[in-house]
C-alpha cells in the first residue's frame, strides 16, 4: 500500500507559529503532526510514502531525510499559487493505477484511523469527524452511503 501526504500549504491560519516551520511540523502533545502520521502509516504496513512539500520545503525535507529516509519527497514549487489538487497531480506518476491513501498533513487523528481505512472491500473511503461543525474545515454531504459533495462551503443545514 502507498500513501500520499499533502504538505505544501502555507498554514497562514496558524501564524505566527508557522512563520518558521510548515504546518505539519507543529507539535501536538509533543509530537509533530507529520511524525504521527508517518509513524501510523508505517505501523499499519504502508510501504511507500510520498510527501508533497512546498512552503518551508527545506525545513520539512531536512526533517524527513533525517528521521524517515524511506519517505519520498515530491516538491511543489508552485505551492503559493496552486491547491491540493495540483500537489496530488504531482504524485500521479508514483500512484497512478494503484490503491493509495491520500492524507492532508495538518490533520491530527487517532491511531486507529489508518487501520480502519485499510480494512474492508470498498476501494474509496473517507474518514470524517462528525463531532461538530467547524467553518474552516472541509465538510461532506451524503446521499445514503455515497459522498455527494466535499467543500468548505457546505452550510450547517446541509452538513
Regions flagged by a language model, labelled:
Residues 1-19:
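N-terminal nucleotide-binding beta1-loop-alpha1 segment
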Residues 2-5, 31-99:
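Conserved N-terminal catalytic core of the sugar/cofactor nucleotidyltransferase
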Residues 7, 53, 104, 128-129:
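Short beta-strand/turn micro-motifs composed of small residues
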Residues 17-19, 38-39, 62-65, 113-116:
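Short amphipathic alpha-helical segments
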Residues 20-35:
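Short catalytic helix/loop segments, enriched in acidic residues and glycine
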Residues 98-108:
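Short beta-strand-to-loop acidic/aromatic patch adjacent to the donor-nucleotide binding site
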Residues 110-159:
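Conserved core of the sugar-phosphate nucleotidyltransferase
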